[in-house]
């Protein structure tokens, strides 16, 4: 089965803010769609919080920033998925969720189309226990907090490996959209 990204209609009640095609790995068709929730999470100092991912996996070497988030579990609402992911990956409660929109992107190496729905939200300084997966424990090097424009610059201009570019361009698109909406660009 091959799915055409340009013909997909997800029938969402919110906008698709971008469609990004994988230009880094050979195209061999797509056989599944993954639905994710992702967060532009802001701390009490007005900085955006990212996961610094470092290591090696199927995609090769990685060293990139990534928004908090992940796949929806069965029968899970997209906002509930983000609340869960923030707890698991950052060890914080998130509040004030504001829907930004969705990005459709492709991952040729794993034959996947992903619909990532982005929210903006806030965390406070109170920690709660994290519950990272084994893979997250290995790949998440640290939590990085950056001012909005520094975050955008790093996402857009500091990616070395192909997978870094795939991930950071998605997150940069969401951040740029949010900052424009807020009049900060």
Q: How should each PLM-predicted stretch be described?
A:
Residues 105-130, 144:
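Active-site-adjacent beta-strand/loop module that shapes the phosphate/pyrophosphate-binding cleft
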Residues 34, 62-67, 94, 114-116:
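Short connector loops at helix/strand junctions that flank enzyme active sites
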Residues 47-88:
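Conserved Nudix-box catalytic region and its N-terminal flanking loop in Nudix hydrolases
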Residues 42-48, 56, 73, 120-128:
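Short, charged/polar surface micro-motifs in flexible loops or helix N-caps
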